[in-house]
């Protein structure tokens, strides 16, 4: 049996995934980190990004994570996220609509900033 680590991926509102793995890759404020059995203990802050889990059975689990913490000690890895979704659970069309809405909001904000600048110039 290969060396394993126990992984718990938990969102603020639910347990997302739990099981045995041989490798977990996550994005932290210090950069991407890969954790394997026997890794030195660590505590870090998660950035928004993908988490990739190589399961003990040879499969791969991918999740989208937004903020939170990563903790590892004694071959137990905890990913405590503000928001986390397994890739299989994500509705692509809904995610694309949300992205377009965010882009349009950013454009509206840029237009507001430009309007304020123009009004400031008019007052001079």
UniProtKB/Swiss-Prot annotation:
Membrane topology: Peripheral membrane protein
Domain of life where this protein originates: Bacteria
Compartments in which it is found: Cell membrane
SUPFAM superfamilies in alphabetical order: Epsilon subunit of F1F0-ATP synthase N-terminal domain
Keyword tags: ATP synthesis, Cell membrane, CF(1), Hydrogen ion transport, Ion transport, Membrane, Transport
Pfam family, one: ATP-synt_DE_N
GO molecular function per UniProt: ATP binding; proton-transporting ATP synthase activity, rotational mechanism
Main location: membrane
Annotated GO CC locations: plasma membrane; proton-transporting ATP synthase complex
Family under the similarity heading: Belongs to the ATPase epsilon chain family.
Quaternary structure annotation from Swiss-Prot or TrEMBL: F-type ATPases have 2 components, CF(1) - the catalytic core - and CF(0) - the membrane proton channel. CF(1) has five subunits: alpha(3), beta(3), gamma(1), delta(1), epsilon(1). CF(0) has three main subunits: a, b and c.
Role of this protein: Produces ATP from ADP in the presence of a proton gradient across the membrane.
NCBIfam families per record: ATP_synt_epsi, PRK13442.1
Protein name per its UniProtKB record: ATP synthase epsilon chain
Provenance organism: Streptomyces griseus subsp. griseus (strain JCM 4626 / CBS 651.72 / NBRC 13350 / KCC S-0626 / ISP 5235)
């Amino acid at each position: 049996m290969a060396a394993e680590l126990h992984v718990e991926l938990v969102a603020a509102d639910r347990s997302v995934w739990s099981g045995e793995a041989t490798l977990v890759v996550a994005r932290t404020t210090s950069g991407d980190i890969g954790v394997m059995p026997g890794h030195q203990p660590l505590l870090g802050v998660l950035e928004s990004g993908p988490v990739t889990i190589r399961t003990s059975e040879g499969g791969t689990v991918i999740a989208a994570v937004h903020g939170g913490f990563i903790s590892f000690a004694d071959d137990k890895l905890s990913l405590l996220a503000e928001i986390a979704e397994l890739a299989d659970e994500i509705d692509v069309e809904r995610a694309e609509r949300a992205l377009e809405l965010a882009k349009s909001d950013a454009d509206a904000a840029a237009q507001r900033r430009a309007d304020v600048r123009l009004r400031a110039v008019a007052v001079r």
